[in-house]
Amino acid sequence: MAIDKIQSESINLADNFAFTGTVTGAGGANTPAFHAYNPQNGSVANQTEVIVSNNTELLDSSAAYDTSTYKFTPQVAGYYFLYANVRYQSGTTDFDRINLVITKNGTDILSARNNNKDYSTVCVSGIVQANGSSDYFQMKSYQNSGGSISITTDDEFTYFGGFLIKKS
């Protein structure tokens, strides 16, 4: 006997269900998505802000991240979750300030700050809106330690990524 309509009162929503057909309207695609990291040591001068050169892609589903300009330019309008992480290797130097910023079209929109010594890590994340054509996002960092220090490299320490969470 086929069931065409089920009353909502007769279903326990806490149960597990096994479907044999196609389920539509559940979930969605989280693309474009990207994740890029910096595999090479780079020295950052004291009191200097730089665009972080994450030039190696782990993921770029829609060719929206440029490894030469370090820009994420999504071609789908919507809301995106973006994240960034940077780690400085300083030995025993005390930092006056380390900033990590995600910019939209060159303007700071998400930022975090840390005052620390030794290995200092800063991360930032948030939800941003993109128009799907000309908006672009970059990751930049500033350090004020009294001297030049290196950004720690590898995909687990310095990276930039994001993905679509809702089309607009």
Q: Language-model segments: which ranges?
A:
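Register-specific beta-strand positions within repetitive beta-rich fiber domains
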Residues: 1-27
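Short, surface-exposed beta-strand/strand-loop-strand elements in extracellular ectodomains
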Residues: 93-107
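Residues that act as N-cap/strand-start positions at coil-to-secondary-structure junctions
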Residues: 5, 66-68, 96, 120-122
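Terminal (often C-terminal
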Residues: 18-79, 83-94, 112, 147, ...
